[in-house]
Amino acid sequence: MKEVVVDVAPKCIKGIEFGALSAKDIIAQSEVEVHTRDLYDLEKGRIPKDGGALDTKMGISSNANECATCHGNLASCHGHFGHIKLALPVFHVGYFKATIQVLQCICKNCSAVLLDEQTKRSFLNDLRRPHIDNLRRMKILKKLLEQCKKQRRCLNCNHVNGVVKKAASGAGPAALKIVHDTFRWIGKKATPEKDLWDKEFDEVFSRNPELEKFVKRIHDDLNPLKVLNLFKQISPSDCELLGIDSARGGRPEMYIWRYLPAPPVCIRPSVMMDAQSNEDDLTIKLTEIVWTSSLIKAGIEKGISINNLMEQWDYLQLSVAMYINSDSANPALLPSSGGGSKSSKPIRGFCQRLKGKQGRFRGNLSGKRVDFSGRTVISPDPNLKIDEVAVPDRVAKVLTYPEKCTRYNRKKLQKLILSGPNVHPGANYLLKQNESAKRNLRFGDRVKLAKNLHIGDVVERHIEDGDIVLFNRQPSLHRLSILSHYAKIRPWRTFRLNECVCTPYNADFDGDEMNIHVPQTEEARAEAINLMGVKNNLLTPKSGEPIIAATQDFITGSYLVSHKDSFFDRASLVQLLCMMSDADIQFDIPPPAIFKPVMLWTGKQVFSLLIKPNKKSNVVINLDAKNKTYTPPAKGFPNEMSPNDGFVIIRGSQILSGVMDKSTLGDGKKHSVFYTILRDYGPDEAANAMNRMAKLCARYLGNRGFSIGINDVIPGSDLKQKKELMVEQAYLKCDELIDLYNRGNLETQPGCNEEQTLEAKIGGLLSKVREEVGEICINELDSANAPLIMATCGSKGSTLNVSQMVAVVGQQIISGNRVPDGFQDRSLPHFTKNSKTPQSKGFVRNSFFSGLTPPEFLFHSISGREGLVDTAVKTAETGYMSRRLMKSLDDLSAQYDHTVRNSSNGIVQFTYGGDGLDPFDMEGDARPVNFVRQWDHAYNITFDIEDKGLLPYQIIELVDSILHPLEDRLVRYDNVGKIIPLEDSDKIEYIDQNDAEREFYQSIREFTTNKATKLAEIREKKMLKPFLTEPAEDFIRLDESDESLVAINQLSKVSANSINKFLEQCIYKYSRAKVEPGTAVGAIGAQSIGEPGTQMTLKTFHFAGVASMNVTLGVPRIKEIINASKVISTPIINSVLVNDDDEIAARVVKGRVEKTLLEDVAYFIEDVYKNNMAYLSIKIDLNTIEKLQLELNIESIAHSIANAPKLKILAGDVSVTGKDRINVLVTLREPKSINLMKNASADYKGTDASIVNSLFFRMQHLKRALPRICIKGLPDISRAVINIRDDGKKELLVEGYGLKEVMSTDGVVGTKTSTNHILEVFQVLGIEAARASIIGEIDYTMSKHGMSVDPRHIQLLGDVMTYKGEVLGITRFGLSKMRDSVLQLASFEKTTDHLFDASFYMKNDKIEGVSECIILGQTMNIGTGAFKLVNSFDVDKKALEMKPTLFEGMCEVSATA
């Protein structure tokens, strides 16, 4: 029976030590030696054979037998190990790499570590440091390995040591061989050992000259037997240097197989099928190993040829390797199991069972299947509250909750027991207090059981209305993909939810399925509803925007209700109010807007009642916001006079102007009605308003009727004509441009060639046509047109979709360009070759209503295909990216000391996000309070005609009197921890943890001072004293009756009450926004960056101001940044110029930076042969040099040629003739070529022919190489483009690497120059700059795609990548440098490598992080696990004092005696 997990168990795993079994351990734990290949004893009727791989001493795999060791059945016996004794030792494939490393560190003769005593001692001291962590230990061992590899001779026995490496493996038998190339270092130097070696071979060659050609490939073969003997000689202190802990029984020979453990039978069960059985891969491999081993043993006893023995040994080696890791051999080269054919599928070794998504780690430890869960299709139900979910009664009967019987609920539980399992509400099981087994209520006497129900018994009852359940939809991309709802049991077969809650789940009702989970303890229920409840998650932690809000039909309904021409008589009004309230709320109906001829109320009044139904409701909101389609009023008029009623003004919960559309009700807007209610009056009120809105809109829209049909998209004849005319005009303009292009007269744009310019211009023209036609189309359509209503209020689609249906579909774009040429020089065979016209390059002039022509249809489907492919590829890319982010950040949490630390207590940030505020509570622009809205709100709710208006200086004084005490509380400490007095604190440069709060108070002060200044200005305009400063005593007399004063009081009176209210709310909101200790800021940050990635487009380029300067954006860019890639697709250095107004100055700097090759400025290079010499003559084009503003003259070019690397031209051979000629003399003075000739023949006389030949080749070589010589600029930089910014200033965009060189170029402001290549920033400017660069780049990429992510999340990612002092990518390599936990790394990637590594170096995992705690089923120390609850006992202090021991007591007695 499953029991509830209890957190406070008496014993708790605090750490896991890894290690390997020695040969002794393997034999000690073994119950039987496996020595025969037979599995079954056929003579005794197919029972498992003794000593075979299925011996019953190792356990059983079916219920029919019983275990011969413990006599248990399948349920009670967990199995026992056996062992196989191998005839010869073999390498362990998991430790193969480590074995090679050990061999590289020791002498291959005497097994001593190849270091002198002093070095050994210093390394030992480093390794024995107390509290050294695994990361530092591994670094030390790596350094030691590097030093040992350099040592050529052993310092102990003076033996020569060469290179130890893995044999060049084809695959198969050679894969696990180690060779020792003894004389690799020696080369030609004579040493006695080498001479002896050569001598021996000479004797062999004299007998068999054929062998001579193999001499290069002769190595010393280190077979497992040799290695085993070497390892046995290693001393314990040397073991420690090799990273093996001999104090814990570690020895290097443990990592070579001599005895092989045979696992219990129950983990490799046989499948019986009528008189024959199917065996597990492991069993078959074990029998192969036993058989091969016995063959070798028999062969050694009989004395078989060495060739056969080695072959069998290799096969044994391979079998053992595949038993552990079946990837270790190439299946194509394996001897096949079934006679002639190749073995079909690779076997599943132990490693294959652990690794991968379905392996033990990810499939069964990090994530498991669970009980008490259900799954079915979802459908909408607007009559449910947003925090409810309708559960079908069939599901409710299966899912149960264990309720303990108390005196309060005994009667209820008795009723449920009587109902039984088939009637809802009922119960399925009963667990009596003193019994261990559950009673199934399907059977037995329920009446009797109900009577005997005692307090303390547990009844597993059906879930009922009001039970807390978790609701989830995959893919769970962020925290809000699983929320807690209250169950509502209903008939039918689907889960139902309010449509407002679709956004966080990203659910729609086209057949989506969702999962439900029922928490089984009171603690779990309390945590679920408080932390995951829908009401507590109306906002997204990504940016603090509302995510649960009105969608689709609700927005359309609200728009139609609140429209200017919506009027309702009393009957309709009352009906609407009942719809929104279930008829259980008292409504205070306001006076009607129209009295005669009949009383009518406006839709805005209905909506005002929705926000505040009656006087008892304390919701008073004040809001000013633009609608989605806001048309500004004529100049000088206030916003509310917008001609299309597009500006919402709400005062005291009364809607005065504007309509309700997506911007005021939808998600993602911080000036929406629900957000305002939530921030000022809490989530309950916001949820109530949302519930009323959902009920009202669904019913209203259903009664009114709202449909879309073909009639809605028929264009008028007028519209058709206008469209045709505009398209024709655009076609004519395009033809003119194409004509210019063909004649070569097209003026190019900066940084583009002619073709790019043509494409850019035509693209601009055609998109403009679509926009203009779209505008006309929208204006022509009737205001009651359904698609138009939806586009206007933002419930679905956009005006672009409407105009594509009605007027024109427009240009089809593929990867940011027009449709490319798919056939020879044309897009489709319907057009002529090299056609650039709009219709041949994907412009669709028809609308979807009029229908597309065949070529248009094809173009449209091409761009549709691109969208599909993009989506499919993107899903996989972003999914993997999110997983990596999550694994790297999952254990970061905010602590009680305000720092952000990881699970091993390493500090990542001193305060979260620099100010310790939670992104969830930000009101605007990542700030905790939206001052403007807060001021209006405070002003409106405290407004009293009797209040006296304050003078400007009084406002400033009042604010100071409230803020000063708060600021004085924030004391500063010096480095020793002493408090710094206030008067000295201004002189301090460094930041402390209270700086953010001081800044916040300062920003309040600035805002209020600004208000006071405005008031003073208004007073001055009305001819009154401004009073910005306090006047002298005798100037206090004021003329109260002044008309100006009355006017000012009406215009902008500021009362003491409203200032107090404003400050009180600002300070309250700031304190509420502080991040709570224990918050999993890392996990939330990872999701906040990963989740928007799924909405980004994949292949995105955008033009950084200049048409041809492409910058990678979207998912690939984010991937580059978080991988910390060394090579990125578009590295761009953005350099600010000293003289940024003058184009000539910019060109000069460009010439200094951009690589200029000789071929760019040379007319020609010709070869000249004369009788006595040959030279290359280069003519330089001085005009080009002048045009490009290059600082070059003929001498500097000659100098560059002479200094060109690799060409070896001597300076004396380069001469300048005239103004524009350079001659390069071609000689054979180059020392190398002469030496070659001398060596070629001993009697070198220097024949003429050979000299002429080599001269000719050198000439041709130089002729080819000279044009590519860089004569100016930085060799790594191929392009630089002058970009004109929006403010008219010029900057240089440089493509390529070389930040340091560009920064130090004359004419560039080095301090303002930056690059988008993170690693280069790190190398040039250091780690802080790299952190700032990571944050800036991710923020830039997100903002380009319109994603709002709070900067705190991005800062945290930047800090995680840099807090170790180097830039670590969010990959398995970066993660292994950040975290030391074996289980965390194993549950990420390369599972088995980490496990073998851990056991070789005997690592210790302390079980601190999230991944490890999940694997071991423990409470993690973040979130609600960040603290422990302690009970206080009333214990006398004396009782806790230490009592003297018996011995001490006797001493005291004797002393007194």
UniProtKB/Swiss-Prot annotation:
Please state the protein's primary subcellular location: nucleus
Binding of Zn(2+) 2 occurs at C107, C110, C154
What Enzyme Commission number(s) appear in the record? Answer: 2.7.7.6
GO cellular component, alphabetical, reads:
chromatin; mitochondrion; RNA polymerase III complex
Annotated region Bridging helix: the residues are 854-866
Record Pfam families: RNA_pol_Rpb1_1 (PF04997), RNA_pol_Rpb1_2 (PF00623), RNA_pol_Rpb1_3 (PF04983), RNA_pol_Rpb1_4 (PF05000), RNA_pol_Rpb1_5 (PF04998)
Annotated GO biological processes are: termination of RNA polymerase III transcription; transcription initiation at RNA polymerase III promoter; tRNA transcription by RNA polymerase III
Q: What residues does Zn(2+) 1 bind to?
A: C67, C70, C77, H80
From the Swiss-Prot or TrEMBL record, state where the protein is found: Nucleus
Binding sites annotated in the UniProt record for Mg(2+):
D508, D510, D512
Q: How does it assemble?
A: Component of the RNA polymerase III (Pol III) complex consisting of 17 subunits.
State the family it belongs to.
Answer: Belongs to the RNA polymerase beta' chain family.
Q: What is this protein called?
A: DNA-directed RNA polymerase III subunit RPC1
Q: Which organism is it from?
A: Debaryomyces hansenii (strain ATCC 36239 / CBS 767 / BCRC 21394 / JCM 1990 / NBRC 0083 / IGC 2968)
Q: What is the lineage of its organism?
A: Eukaryota, Fungi, Dikarya, Ascomycota, Saccharomycotina
UniProt gene name: RPC1
